[in-house]
């Protein structure tokens, strides 16, 4: 599998061990749906086997990103081929994800040892891990999965979404009272800014949350989150890595635009006609900007979408620069998904 991001424009490879291989398999499934060519189906099914083997090895699975891993790979594979192996792997991953649930605070703990006070928190990215639980509830009839997904969504809506429509990346919770302690950032510029990719997760995550729950409040949060994102775009419609920036030389994050476009397309059936037209136009502008400014030329080992950011250091966060102005797997995947959503009557892998 490709590593999470390119280095000097080229992906290195490793076994199925990081949080991102599901996006690569998802791209194989998208390519299969677009072309009907068996080479993509065969490759994707071979990769599904590696996801099942990873569960047996218990290889780096003690975190919340099981949805990113198993939805675009195994859930998609089951839907497209009826593969029993894909279904079983996805159900096992969903069962493991429930073990991250913290009843005190009602959220899925993102990282670290369960009940570690230093890691007692949720992050906005996890909204895209919840579809695995909704799918498992549908498949098994076990309400435990949907109850956890619903509870986490409600907590995220309360503690990660600000009144102005911007979002926090992460929020620490009190393990005794379950109340929020403080909202912080891990990969954004600073705690009170809006990390662009996190904002995009919020857009797509709330659009999906509304699909699953039909809660009007989640559609309103989608609207506010999308409006904030769109008003912070520079003239070329490719967002900076943090939305605190609207001009200058800071790196752009093309992956945030791709994810946000998918969120806007996802919400279209839920919107009144005039609003639907505006949302479609906004999504089209984002997608056009990616095609014009970020689409990668064909290159062995290269990515699909240039100018992404994995981590960007700032005076206020603790990350080091990694994958800055490079392609990354989630950007490549969601760019392909956005193109698919725009050009086909496509059933999403996420719902």
PLM region spans:
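Glycan-recognition and catalytic cores of secretory/periplasmic carbohydrate-active enzymes
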Residues: 1-351
